[in-house]
């Protein structure tokens, strides 16, 4: 009731349900997978009325032996002993620069410090077996991320997110 009537909701749950037979969720983590993020970005583009590239415009990359947050939460060795592949997609044919500003957050989720802006990759490469692979996109949550691409279409987007939103921005570079 407080949003402008021009703000359009994007129902990602129905879209994810249509792809439930695919690997849209990570088995060892509490997040959806990069493929789930792809379908969410696709639905966002449909609702926004903007073009969207299919997966053939992305390079498929894999970090093998990923064990996500569910092991950290549960300490259940059956999760640790059954790692999965963390499959993600990097846009082809588009150049981009990513600038970050890190923030320090206390236990009450209050910002207690701000770092200086720095340039780093958008897609971080993790070694096989590394438990941090979910941070492949943007390297985590406690930072402001600005991406400038070689796509000149006059559009801009701002994403306010928690960790579930990490999978979305990499599909919006075109």
Where are these regions (language model features)?
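Extracellular glycan-modifying ectodomains
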Residues: 1-174
């Amino acid at each position: 009731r407080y949003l402008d009537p021009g703000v359009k909701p994007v129902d990602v749950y129905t879209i994810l349900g249509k792809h439930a037979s695919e690997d849209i969720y990570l088995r060892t983590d509490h997040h959806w997978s990069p493929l789930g993020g792809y379908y969410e970005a696709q639905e966002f583009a449909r609702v926004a009325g903007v073009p969207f590239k299919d997966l053939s415009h992305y390079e498929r990359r894999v970090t093998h032996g990923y064990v996500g947050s569910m092991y950290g939460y549960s300490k259940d060795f059956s999760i640790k002993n059954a790692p999965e592949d963390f499959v993600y997609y990097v846009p082809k044919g588009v150049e981009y620069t990513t600038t970050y500003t890190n923030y320090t957050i206390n236990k009450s989720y209050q910002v207690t410090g701000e770092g200086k802006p720095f340039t780093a990759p958008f897609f971080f490469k993790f070694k096989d077996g590394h438990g941090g692979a979910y941070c492949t996109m943007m390297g985590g949550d406690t930072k402001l991320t600005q991406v400038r691409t070689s796509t000149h279409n006059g559009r801009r987007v701002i994403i306010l997110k928690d960790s579930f939103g990490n999978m979305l921005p990499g599909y919006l570079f075109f």
